[in-house]
Amino acid sequence: MYLQELLKGIQVEKIIGNMDIDIEDIYFDSRFVTQKSLFICIEGFKTTGSLYINEAIQRGAVAILSEKEIAIEGTTTIKVENSRKALAAVASRFYKFPTNTLKLVGVTGTNGKTSITYMVKSILGYYNINVGLIGTISNWIGNKEIEAVRTTPESLELQKILNEMVEQKVDTCVMEVSSHALELGRVDHTKFTMGIFTNLTPEHLDFHEDMDHYRNAKKKLFYKTTLCNIINVDDIHGKMIAEELKEEQIPLITFGMNQQADVYATDLKINLKGVSFQLHMGQDSKEFHVKIPGLFTVYNAMPSILICYILGLSLEEISIALEAMKGVPGRFEVVEEIQRNSVIIDYAHTPDALENILISTRKFAPKRIITVFGCGGDRDKTKRRIMGEISGKYSDYSIITSDNPRTEEPLKIIEMIEDGIKQVTDQYKIMIDRRCAIEYAMKIAEEKDIIILAGKGHEKTQVIGNEVFYFDDREVALEIARKEGLI
């Protein structure tokens, strides 16, 4: 595509050089630049793309787009006000505006995004509908799995994936949309058929400053939709968003446990094997069963059912497919091989998520709940004390350990968690090494105790300092169980 065509619709402040050149690819990472490509300099948090212009040119870039005015002999340079926004616009055009063709469902909120996207993929896939998924665990183009680097890909990668979905005849893509992606413009120039709001609890406040900024970032999704939005109004922030959207006459459907919602659930039954509930939608009512325990499962199932219903499936069809679903990796995942007591792997790494899983487990726990958890380093520090209080309040015994300490001192993170837990209980132990913490939990657990390994879920790495080590909670639990003769 010619550079002049590629830059249509972008506010260009200055161009130096020839615009009549053919661009064969686009990059923002100089390490991957190829011949006849456009290199876009992204202003990052740790470095800036303009430092890598020479490398990009050496590798074959024929044009440079930057927020800085640069003159380079033999290379076309383009100055723009915001290179991230320009990247999104250029990427969408280069990959032929894939969301003009593809049905795209965006799911945003602090918790529940992964579970909802997997539920929708599972339900639609049950009826052989070609489905795409973009999210935290992995990306899927039909039956092809692609590794996910972040919850929502950078705009260039996103448009490339969406374009491949169109080429592979994918009917619908369901996608996790993070607040970072919305705030940083990764989903600019992307049309969503539907937008889903799950809930909002303190998270990423190191980035968003406060809850108002966090909510406003999430709300941006609902102005990008072409059909409707589905909002959880049991959540105070969801209720605020719904009221604002109604005032602006933006189509939406509300859901919750409250019968004032457009769609609501009653007659909940929750145990270790799953949940059942009655869903009420207008004049229709239907019982649903899901093999994932917890109240949060009902909150995840309701929008999933609505999405699939709007996309054309009947409630009966959805019910059959949802009951057949086995679960979501690292989301209340019971390690079935261990029988003496229940070991549950969950991604709960926010105060709300940890509280939800502990309260849900308490409702059917026959004996003690032993929780192994930590908090990530180089991330929001305000949640550490809160999570300590929550584990202390709802667990019978807690083991505070490491969870991706990154460049922070692990013990310092643990001490901040301890500040919270010691306010409510003395039933806890500190063990910096996560493997040792899991082993200790399994050694002290008695028959029918429930061990919750919280925070990492599907993750298969532990980040300590600047090094990444292989670590899988599930595999570690199984290794210890075999060693202790529990399998």
Curated annotation (Swiss-Prot):
Superkingdom to which the source organism belongs: Bacteria
Cofactor: Mg(2+)
Pathway: Cell wall biogenesis; peptidoglycan biosynthesis
Gene Ontology process terms (BP): cell division; cell wall organization; peptidoglycan biosynthetic process; regulation of cell shape
Positions that bind UDP-N-acetyl-alpha-D-muramoyl-L-alanyl-D-glutamate: 30, 151-152, 178, 186
Keyword match RNA-binding: no
UniProt EC number: 6.3.2.13
Residues the entry annotates as binding ATP: 109-115
GO molecular function: ATP binding; magnesium ion binding; UDP-N-acetylmuramoylalanyl-D-glutamate-2,6-diaminopimelate ligase activity
Function recorded in the entry: Catalyzes the addition of meso-diaminopimelic acid to the nucleotide precursor UDP-N-acetylmuramoyl-L-alanyl-D-glutamate (UMAG) in the biosynthesis of bacterial cell-wall peptidoglycan.
Post-translational modification comment from the UniProt entry: Carboxylation is probably crucial for Mg(2+) binding and, consequently, for the gamma-phosphate positioning of ATP.
Catalytic EC class: ligase
Reactions it catalyzes: UDP-N-acetyl-alpha-D-muramoyl-L-alanyl-D-glutamate + meso-2,6-diaminopimelate + ATP = UDP-N-acetyl-alpha-D-muramoyl-L-alanyl-gamma-D-glutamyl-meso-2,6-diaminopimelate + ADP + phosphate + H(+)
Protein's organism: Alkaliphilus oremlandii (strain OhILAs)
Positions contributing to meso-2,6-diaminopimelate binding: 379, 403-406, 455, 459
Protein family per UniProt: Belongs to the MurCDEF family. MurE subfamily.
Location in or out of the cell: Cytoplasm
Matching InterPro entries: Mur-like_cat_sf (IPR036565), Mur_ligase_C (IPR004101), Mur_ligase_C_dom_sf (IPR036615), Mur_ligase_cen (IPR013221), Mur_ligase_N (IPR000713), MurE/MurF_N (IPR035911), UDP-N-AcMur-Glu-dNH2Pim_ligase (IPR005761)
GO CC annotation: cytoplasm
Alphabetic keyword roster: ATP-binding, Cell cycle, Cell division, Cell shape, Cell wall biogenesis/degradation, Cytoplasm, Ligase, Magnesium, Nucleotide-binding, Peptidoglycan synthesis
Motif (Meso-diaminopimelate recognition motif): 403-406
Modified-residue entries (N6-carboxylysine), positions: 218
Descriptive protein name: UDP-N-acetylmuramoyl-L-alanyl-D-glutamate--2,6-diaminopimelate ligase
Cross-referenced SUPFAM superfamilies: MurD-like peptide ligases, catalytic domain, MurD-like peptide ligases, peptide-binding domain, MurE/MurF N-terminal domain
